[in-house]
């Protein structure tokens, strides 16, 4: 037969040559690719491969995953599904026959060692007992010898020796009993220790055998020559292991459901527990009193015995429901707490910060007050305002005020027309309310505000936009009410006043009279020892204009006005309007910094990016420094006069701040317009509703106000009540007008007048405003107003009588009474009464009145007529028809 080489054998069995060479080497045969292979070598290689393939694995690891869904209840009564994955890993080890033989040999050696140790212990115990017996015999012999010697030596003391011997024998017997008991206890302790040690060794050996053998102890080992059943045996063992694992897991689950860990411990450690221990474990597993323990799926925590104190964050306003949610309590508990504090509220009602703080602290929580304008503060703080050390001198901002027709407008027009360059004359029509004038000594910015209302609003908002007030007083007219109001506003703002005595060119001018009158209000000239400069000017001829400008600049130099030119700009809105082509336009007077085109401006409720800037003559400018008025375009809406304009970094944050301001303004407005409370509603639901005449009273002095209030309240009666909504001393302000509009009241001014802002509100709301200088005139007009609110009286007046002479029948009107007018006049469609024997039997309306077949409107005394009574046909001859009319009598208050 041809020799088979390793290479040809590899090609025949379709395996690489290198692998076949390696397999020969593993079988102990050294071959190369060109060496020949004999039949015996082939059989040797096949036997080697069969042994390798037929060897079952000693260890098998099974990993199983179990997925399930658990529904967990959450807040709000809803449940949440949670995906749960349980991973189990079991490792099964097959016992090695050699290891089993070795373990059996070790077990045999251990048992022999235990038997040897037990025999040794028994021998030691026997020897110890033998030595104890010998010692006992020796002691007894010695005692006997002593006893004999004592009897022979002391015959005289036999009785005494006998008495002494008895307790010695008793003590000897007691000692022997104690020694025997100790020997018995020692033997029992030794035997118990040996048995315990043997039991522990046996238990450890059994546990090790179970770990080594696992569940494969009884599995038949595969035959050495059987290589085809390898996968079948492996899968069979795996299935058995999985089934056993499933049974074990199911048993654990059932044991947990029935009794928890105590039951499981009872089952697993039954071999090592006594019967009493098992009974005790069974009692514990059933709850101690024979009751079934609850399922482990129930909640393992109890309701807290103490209330949980929380940190409650409260803003400026909060609803009752939100407050209850933050304290983790029900809304009804919060309402109960508020009722205990004396406040009634619903669950959706908005309460203020103080009330919410009291309620939260009453319920034992810690309150953290939060300012809702934190964003606004952060936006304002994140601004580059420049260094205060780099402050430079700036132009003064001058507001010209004065009474109507005192030449204020003419003075402004003259200054503007003479100081504005000729090339800029065409831009005068672009009047924006503010402009600056260049003089030889410096620049001055004038504010042309419409009256003093805008000036007051600016001072109230702390704009600090006005530095100097020029008070214009006509030399021929003197001090007037608006002049006094201007002085009061200037003093309230702590702004210096420069007095311009206008119309000095008139023949009737009297400058000294103006000085005397102004002195009464605290404006004292410098030549009289005061601080106010007085300049005589004429807006018509231009006399004294330069002196006025010099006085303004001198006052500004004394004030040392400075501003930071670098950094983000801030200013105040002088006026604003809506232009059709350009949108919202605002006139801004820059106070600090530099306003550039493209800056983001936050202005009151509005915001936006500056798209264009123009000066007072309509020219486009790229930037504006301090004390320069400019028109800006690009805001989201028309801002209010007096609002502060601020340049910020982030347009998004500017929008949020503007929206927050709008929301707060809306809340305040709605709160002011809130309807009457429940108590007022019940108070108004009384029988015979009493009319109320609401009055807002302003007087010049407090005594007059009290006297008028008492006199008006005494005019009240059962039908009309006079209610003084508000009273005070001083002029009628915008607040008074707003109060009168809200309460539907009449404004009464006693020796006082309303200012411009109040007049605007009065005109807009169409309020009733009356001025008085005599208290009696005021009381009489209030009486007339109350009389108009009284219910009128009605009186029936008889205007005619007609006697029925005959009765006719008409197909159209029924019974027609032929009558003779005996008194007065009978008129058609008037009310009538039918009297029979001076008793009223019917009251109705006269429907038809005829004379000689002609319809007439009236029939006078002594004439005959036919009368048809509406809806009444029982008219008889001899009846009297009484014609009357109802007259309304206007009531008056005495």
UniProtKB/Swiss-Prot annotation:
Residues 538-540 are annotated as: G5. Residues 255-269 have a biased composition (Basic residues). One of its GO terms (molecular function) is guanosine tetraphosphate binding. Residues 402-409 are annotated as: G1. Residues 68-82, 155-168 have a biased composition (Polar residues). Keywords: Cytoplasm, GTP-binding, Initiation factor, Nucleotide-binding, Protein biosynthesis. Residues 448-451 are annotated as: G3. Residues 107-154, 171-214, 237-254, 270-283 have a biased composition (Basic and acidic residues). It is found in: Cytoplasm. One of the essential components for the initiation of protein synthesis. Protects formylmethionyl-tRNA from spontaneous hydrolysis and promotes its binding to the 30S ribosomal subunits. Also involved in the hydrolysis of GTP during the formation of the 70S ribosomal complex. This is Translation initiation factor IF-2.
């Amino acid at each position: 037969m041809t020799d088979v080489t390793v290479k040809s054998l590899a090609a025949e069995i379709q395996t690489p040559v290198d692998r076949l060479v390696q397999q020969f080497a593993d079988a102990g045969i050294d071959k190369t690719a060109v060496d020949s292979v004999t039949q015996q070598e082939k059989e040797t290689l096949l036997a080697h491969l069969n042994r390798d393939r037929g060897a079952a694995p000693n260890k098998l690891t099974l990993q199983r995953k179990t997925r399930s869904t658990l529904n967990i209840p959450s807040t709000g009564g809803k449940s949440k599904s949670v995906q749960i994955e349980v991973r189990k890993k079991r490792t099964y080890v097959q016992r090695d026959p050699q290891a089993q033989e070795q373990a059996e040999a070790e077990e045999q050696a251990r048992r022999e060692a235990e038997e040897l140790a037990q025999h040794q212990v028994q021998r030691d115990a026997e020897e110890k007992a033998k030595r104890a017996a010998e010692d006992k015999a020796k002691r007894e012999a010695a005692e006997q010898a002593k006893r004999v010697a004592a009897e022979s030596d002391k015959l005289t003391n036999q009785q005494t020796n006998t008495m002494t011997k008895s307790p010695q024998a008793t003590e000897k017997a007691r000692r022997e009993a104690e020694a025997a008991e100790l020997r018995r206890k020692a033997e029992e302790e030794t035997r118990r220790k040996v048995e315990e040690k043997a039991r522990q060794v046996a238990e450890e050996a059994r546990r090790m055998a179970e770990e080594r053998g696992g569940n494969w102890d009884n599995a038949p080992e595969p035959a050495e020559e059987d290589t085809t059943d390898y996968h079948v045996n492996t899968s069979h063992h795996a299935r058995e292991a999985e089934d056993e694992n499933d049974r074990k897991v199911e048993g654990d689950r059932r044991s947990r459901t029935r009794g928890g860990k105590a039951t499981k411990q009872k089952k697993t450690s039954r071999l090592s527990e006594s019967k009493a221990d098992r009974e005790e474990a069974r009692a514990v597993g059933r709850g101690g009193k024979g009751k079934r323990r609850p399922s482990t799926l129930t909640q393992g925590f109890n309701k807290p015995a103490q209330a949980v104190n929380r940190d409650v964050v409260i803003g400026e306003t909060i609803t009752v429901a939100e407050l209850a949610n933050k304290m983790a309590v029900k809304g009804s508990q919060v309402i109960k707490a508020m009722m205990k504090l004396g406040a009634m509220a619903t669950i959706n009602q908005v309460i203020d910060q103080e009330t919410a703080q009291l309620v939260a602290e009453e319920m034992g929580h810690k309150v953290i007050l939060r300012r809702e304008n934190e964003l606004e503060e952060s936006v304002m703080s994140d601004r580059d305002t420049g260094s205060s050390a780099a402050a430079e001198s700036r132009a003064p901002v001058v507001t010209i005020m004065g009474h109507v027709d005192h030449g204020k407008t003419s003075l402004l027009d003259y200054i503007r027309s003479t100081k504005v360059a000729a090339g800029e004359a065409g831009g005068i029509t672009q009047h924006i309310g503010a402009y600056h004038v260049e003089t030889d000594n410096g620049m001055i910015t004038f504010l042309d505000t419409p009256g003093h209302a805008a000036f007051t609003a600016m001072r109230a908002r702390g704009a600090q936009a006005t530095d100097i007030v020029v008070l214009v007083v006509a030399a021929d007219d003197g001090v007037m009410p608006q002049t006094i109001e201007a002085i009061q506003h200037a003093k309230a703002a702590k702004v210096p006043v420069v007095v311009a005595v206008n119309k000095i060119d008139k023949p009737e001018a009297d400058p000294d009279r103006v000085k005397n009158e102004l002195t009464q209000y605290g404006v004292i000239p410098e030549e009289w020892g005061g601080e106010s400069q007085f300049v005589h000017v004429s807006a018509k001829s231009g006399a004294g204009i330069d002196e006025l400008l010099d006085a303004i600049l001198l006052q500004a130099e004394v004030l040392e006005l400075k501003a930071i030119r670098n950094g983000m700009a801030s200013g105040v809105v002088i006026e604003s309007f809506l232009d059709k082509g350009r949108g919202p336009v605002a006139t801004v007077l820059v106070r600090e910094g530099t306003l550039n085109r493209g800056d983001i401006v936050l202005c009151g409720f509005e915001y936006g990016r500056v798209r264009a800037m123009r000066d007072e003559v309509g020219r486009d400018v790229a930037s504006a420094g301090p004390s320069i008025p400019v028109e800006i375009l690009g805001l989201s809406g028309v801002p209010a006069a007096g609002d502060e304009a601020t340049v910020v970094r982030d347009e998004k944050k500017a929008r949020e701040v503007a929206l927050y301001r709008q929301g707060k303004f809306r809340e305040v407005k709605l709160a002011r317009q809130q309807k009457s409370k429940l108590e007022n509603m019940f108070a108004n639901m009384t029988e015979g509703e009493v009319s109320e005449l609401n009055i807002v009273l302003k007087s010049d002095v407090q005594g007059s106000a009290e006297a008028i209030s008492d006199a008006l309240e005494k005019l009240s009666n059962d039908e009309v009540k006079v209610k003084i909504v508000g009273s005070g001393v001083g002029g009628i302000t915008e607040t008074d007008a707003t109060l009168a509009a809200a309460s539907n009241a009449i404004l009464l001014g006693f020796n006082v007048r309303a200012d411009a802002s109040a007049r605007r509100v009065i005109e807009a709301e169409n309020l009733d405003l009356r001025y008085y200088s005599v208290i009696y005139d005021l009381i009489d007009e209030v009486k007339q107003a109350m009389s108009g609110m009284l219910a009128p009286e009605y009186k029936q007046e008889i205007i005619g009588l007609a006697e029925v002479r005959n009765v006719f029948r008409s197909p159209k009107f029924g019974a027609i009474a032929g009558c003779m007018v005996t008194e007065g006049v009978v008129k058609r469609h008037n009310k009538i009464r039918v009297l029979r024997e001076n008793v009223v039997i019917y009251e109705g309306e006269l429907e038809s009145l005829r004379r000689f077949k002609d319809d007439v409107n009236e029939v006078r005394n002594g004439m005959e007529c036919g009368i048809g009574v509406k809806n009444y046909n029982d008219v008889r001859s001899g009846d009297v028809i009484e014609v009357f009319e109802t007259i309304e009598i206007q009531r008056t208050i005495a």
